[in-house]
A protein has these predicted regions:
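Conserved, single-site charged/polar hotspot
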Residues: 2-465, 475, 483, 504, ...
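Short aromatic-acidic-glycine turn motif
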Residues: 408-410, 490-494
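Residue-level detector of high-confidence beta-strand sites
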Residues: 415-417, 496-499, 511
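Signal that preferentially marks extracellular ectodomain short beta-strand elements
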Residues: 428-429, 509-512
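Exposed beta-strand face motif in extracellular beta-rich ectodomains
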Residues: 434-438, 480, 515-519
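Glycan-association/targeting regions that enable binding to alpha-glucans and other polysaccharides
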Residues: 468
């Protein structure tokens, strides 16, 4: 079962959903910008059964352990088991070293008993070893059972007895321990020992029930000592608070239809648990359904993210052909992600939510994929005051804002909120007011910026008496030099015939006698402006 603060690792053999290449009718979305992908989610763990943080919240609100269990496992009955002991696999390896701090006994497969002094022995598949006093022992016939008054030690101390068997290649070490003493070491390994008594009692019953529901009574051992079953920390893990919770619920198990209930548990639901058939594609189980988890908000993992991923990272993980353009999800009845569809320029690929969770190291399958992209502006020059639109995609992300900054400055300034259409796209009307960079943000997530190239709007006309060229520059840029240019009628080339400065009102004039021909005004402004040109004016 789940170790607290760590999601359970379950290996699920799910059928692969493969769409690895473009089909004849495939059409990638018309997205020009580089998308930023943001994943946010809720909860930690598989979400089936009891949420530990939610149980803690119920305890804080005065619920007793039986009421808490009834909420998470609806329809179950609190009963009492007659099982007294359990066998825990500690090792399956080529060699183990075990020890005792006091005298201990060895009984072999022939029922012969050997008393040994305090010390350690190292066993190999031949079951031949030296006794703690250095005496060369004979080869024993397995299985070997070690007992002592003090806890036996394999890396750490354990209650109960050790049994060693060999298949000729590896030896198996199993700890047989009274069921309640097993729970003394499990409950504090799965839930913080400082939590309220009713939460710890809830954990004790869930752990006891789970152990008996999954035990392999016909095999060489019943349960593993790690997350494949439940974490069993030995004597060192025990705590007075959790021991008291075990003792207060001694023998207590949940049953359904007269059978021990399979009481999965996990860290954090995010606000709602999941039905077993939504998580592992198994048959529905009446007491493992999706239920509200209102007090789960206490958990630091109730909500998580946003986690930003580059297109390159997701492209590799999601195995999409071509540049990654979009990621879409489908969810099941428990609000968990069933499938993830990655869309690239050359095709798409579909994975399960569980596969994506594992590949990206997410806390749960209750997540959403936000996509944020801003289409780059074309590399053309717009005149001051021209209207244009900024377009892009901003799906499944909160509080989108358009930001801008001026050339030479580091600070981004919020220009306006961005409204999203039903399909996640946006189109924002903007006027070219100055050379600027734009980006769209959601919290700390930002698109790559796009530059707006703007030229001053320059107007030029000739006076009625044909003696003066006059005009204006917008926006007003006082002191900006204006070049008056004349076009050579033969070559078509432009030559500057005069330079004047724009006034504080943005106006300029040139009064020398005019030659016949075509004129224009050319403005080169500082501050990142593009060259501004007036329309041509003909004098003649």
């Amino acid at each position: 079962m789940v170790i607290f603060r760590r999601a359970i690792v379950l290996v699920l053999l799910l059928s692969a959903l493969v769409v690895g290449r473009a089909s004849a009718g495939f059409a990638p979305p018309a997205l020009k910008g580089t998308p930023q992908f943001v994943i946010s989610g809720h909860g930690w763990g598989h979400a089936v059964g009891m949420g530990q943080w939610g149980a803690y919240g119920y305890a804080q609100h005065g619920f007793t352990y039986d009421k808490i269990l009834a909420h998470y496992y609806p329809g179950t009955v609190l009963s009492t088991t007659t099982v007294k002991s359990i066998r825990v696999l500690l090792a399956n390896t080529k060699s183990v070293t075990i020890s005792s701090t006091g005298p201990w006994k060895l009984k072999d497969g022939s029922a012969a008993t050997t008393t040994m002094p305090a010390g350690k022995v190292t066993l190999n598949p031949e079951l031949k070893f030296k006794l703690p006093d250095g005496t060369e022992a004979e080869t024993f016939t397995g299985p070997l059972t070690f007992t002592a008054a003090a806890p036996l030690v394999f890396k750490k101390p354990y209650r109960g007895t050790f049994t060693v068997t060999s298949d000729g290649k590896k030896i198996t070490l199993v700890n047989t321990v009274p069921l309640e003493q097993y729970l003394y070491a499990v409950v504090p390994s799965e839930m913080p020992k400082t939590w309220l008594p009713e939460a710890l009692k809830t954990q004790a019953v869930a752990a006891r029930s789970y152990a008996l529901a999954v035990r392999k009574a016909s095999g060489p051992f019943d349960v593993y000592d790690d997350t494949r079953s439940q974490v069993y920390g030995g004597v060192n893990a025990e705590s007075p608070t959790t021991t008291a919770a075990v003792d207060a619920t001694v023998g207590g198990v949940l049953t359904y239809g007269g059978k021990i209930a399979l009481t999965y548990f996990f860290s954090t639901s995010g606000g709602r648990t999941a039905a077993i058939n939504d998580v592992w594609k198994s048959a529905p189980v009446p007491y493992l359904v999706s239920v509200a988890d209102p007090y789960d908000s206490l958990s630091p993992y109730h909500d998580w993210g946003p986690l930003a991923f580059t297109p390159a990272k997701l492209k590799t993980v999601l195995k999409v052909p071509g540049r990654l353009l979009d990621v879409q999800t489908t969810v099941n009845g428990s609000q968990r992600v069933d499938s993830v569809r990655a869309i690239g320029e050359k095709g798409e690929h579909v994975l399960t939510g569980a596969e994506v969770r594992t590949a990206l190291g997410l806390r749960s399958t209750w997540f959403s994929v936000g996509v944020l992209a801003l289409d780059p502006l074309p590399a053309t020059t717009l005149q001051y005051g021209t209207s244009f639109r900024l377009t892009g995609l901003g799906r499944a992300l909160p509080d989108l804002r358009l930001e801008q900054r001026s050339p030479g400055t580091a600070e981004w300034v919020v220009k306006r909120d961005v409204e999203i259409d039903d399909d996640g796209s946006f189109s924002v009307a903007v006027k070219a007011a100055a050379p600027e960079e734009f980006r769209v943000t959601s919290g700390t997530i930002a698109t790559p910026s796009t530059k707006l190239v703007v030229a001053p709007r320059v107007a030029l006309k000739v006076s009625g008496d044909l003696t003066t060229l006059k005009g204006s520059v917008r926006p007003v840029l006082p002191g900006t030099p204006v070049q008056i240019q004349h076009q050579n009628a033969t070559t078509g080339r432009w030559g500057t015939v005069s330079k004047v400065d724009a006034t504080r009102m943005g106006r300029f004039a040139w009064t020398p006698q005019l030659l016949d021909g075509t004129y224009r005004a050319r403005v080169i402004a500082r501050g990142g402006w593009a060259v501004g040109l007036s329309k041509k004016v003909f004098v003649g």
